A protein has these predicted regions:
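Short internal beta-strands
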Residues: 78, 194-199, 349-351, 370-378
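Nucleotide phosphate-binding/pyrophosphate-handling subdomain across enzymes
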Residues: 134-135, 139-144, 152-162, 166-170, ...
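Glycine/aspartate-rich loop-and-adjacent alpha/beta segment that forms the canonical ThDP
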Residues: 428-439
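C-terminal helical cap/extension that packs against the catalytic core
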Residues: 201-220, 320-323, 360-421
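Extended acidic/charged loop-beta regions that coordinate divalent cations
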Residues: 81, 124-173, 205-248
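ATP-dependent carboxylate-amine ligase catalytic core
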Residues: 22-29, 33-44, 70-156, 172-174, ...
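Membrane-proximal helix-turn-helix segments that form the acceptor-binding/catalytic region
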Residues: 182-191
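Short functional linear segments
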Residues: 1-53, 60-62, 66-71
């Protein structure tokens, strides 16, 4: 098999949540443990950081990887989903896994996989863990795929666990209350391993506290002592932060939600410092070194790690075009605020969703005065463009329906004046289709 054929095999022969939804979700870690045993427990060969939560875990994971790279570590990064190419999921120092490694891994292990009937994510996780060992990484940042307790990344014992926040998503699998979802996410808390919680509320905080106490895990709530005291959004993109103890630092990632992600990140860096992975800041020389690494890491996250789709400016002007992967109510509560702040003559929104989200909840958050281009991503779970158009009309949102993201985007470009603004989003797959079109 060549690389494309190998990807098709993975997408079609292994149950894939991104394409099939809940029917591809496997409860239990039996397959994961069997794969881990087969490959000789590769994740034990390097340090790991485990990042879960509903929203923000991708940005936090990539930011951590960028800072650790700047500190001189060889850093593995495992995230999902990919937007354009499967290899985005598995990176070392920003470089995607090679096509040849993907092909060789699948071809050499196919006979072992097929009797197990593993899911796509089980195979991909095993590939990532083995690749990081084979390539001798120092540390790997591992993003949870879905939930936490039963996620197949949850066989690692990390240096620190991170849970960014909790909101409603995948409720058919994780539970229909915030407390139930938090309990699933809290499943990544390991005995004696520090855990940082980015955001919590009266419903979720007791869940985290109880689990941490049960596991004798030191717990830090980032909200209790926020490090980011100011965030200035720069016209050209990115954010200028004022951080307690460190002063002003420029971050390259856009998005009104990024200050919360950075607030989550700072206590994680403190844990890594305490464990000797980062320079201690008590001495002037160390403080200067750490500040440089922090500035360089946060200032070049996208460049160092390949992160895309987070308030990404894909066309800077005439008209300006931005895309974002926000896909649930929690994400859109932030995106709607950001869209309200955009200065333009008319806003054009290319929009599509998948069918297992709270579609009405998201539609209610969208700006009523925008012109809409409803579309369907190239994904089996995507809502049909006409159905979405009709559902949106009940929320006072009006526009035409287009069968592909490319056609919707081209229509928006034709209609938009120089001083208009175009936004593309609603799901990761819509953004992925856009980036494929642009590439």
């Amino acid at each position: 098999m060549n690389y494309q054929e190998t990807c098709e095999y993975l997408f079609r022969q292994t149950p894939m949540f991104e394409h099939q939804g809940a029917s591809a979700y496997k409860e239990g870690l039996d397959n994961t443990l069997a794969l881990d045993e087969h490959f000789g427990h590769p994740h034990r060969a390097y340090a790991t950081i485990h990042v879960g939560g509903t929203n923000g875990k991708g940005s936090v994971s990539h930011s951590l990887a960028a800072i650790l790279q700047e500190c001189g570590y060889r850093v593995g990064l495992y995230t999902s989903p990919h937007l354009v190419d499967f290899r985005e999921r598995i990176r070392i120092n920003g470089q995607p896994i090679s096509e040849s490694y993907v092909v060789d891994f699948v071809e050499s292990e196919r006979a072992f996989f097929e009797p197990l009937h593993p899911s796509f994510f089980e195979v991909t996780t095993a590939m990532a863990f083995k690749y990081f060992r084979d390539m001798e990484v120092d540390v790997a940042v591992i993003e949870v795929g879905l939930g936490g307790r039963l996620d197949c990344t949850n066989i690692i014992t990390p240096v620190v666990s991170v849970i960014t926040n909790i909101s409603f998503d995948h409720t058919q699998l994780l539970g229909d209350t915030l407390a139930k979802i938090a309990a699933e996410k809290a499943g990544i808390i390991k005995r004696g391993v520090p855990v940082v919680i980015g955001e919590a509320n009266g419903e979720t905080r007791p869940v985290f506290e109880a689990k941490a106490q049960e596991m004798q895990a030191p717990i830090v709530f980032a909200e209790d002592e926020p490090m980011v005291v100011n965030a200035e959004f720069k016209p050209e993109g990115g954010i200028r932060y004022t951080i307690r103890m460190f002063g002003q630092i420029d971050g390259d990632l856009g998005g009104i939600y990024q200050p919360k992600n950075l607030n989550t990140l700072m206590p994680v860096l403190k844990v890594l410092t305490d464990k000797g992975y980062l320079a201690r800041c008590e001495e002037p020389d160390n403080l200067s070194k750490f500040l440089y690494e922090l500035k360089e890491g946060l200032g070049h996250v996208a460049e160092k790690t390949g992160l895309t789709g987070r308030w990404q400016v894909v066309r800077p002007s005439a008209p300006k075009v931005v895309c974002d992967t926000g896909h649930n109510v929690g994400g859109w509560q932030h995106l709607s605020q950001q869209l309200q702040q955009v200065q333009c003559r008319q806003m054009h929104i290319v929009f599509g969703m998948v069918d297992d989200k709270d579609i009405d909840g998201v539609l209610e958050l969208l700006p009523k005065t925008a012109t809409y281009y409803f579309t369907k991503a190239d994904n089996h779970r995507a809502v049909g463009e006409t159905k979405l158009q009709q559902q949106a009309a009940r929320h006072g949102l009006n526009g035409m329906a287009y069968p592909t993201v490319a056609k919707a985007y081209k229509a928006a470009l034709r209609a938009a004046a120089h001083d208009d603004f175009i936004f593309i989003g609603g799901s990761s797959y819509v953004v992925g289709d856009l980036l494929k079109t642009l590439n």
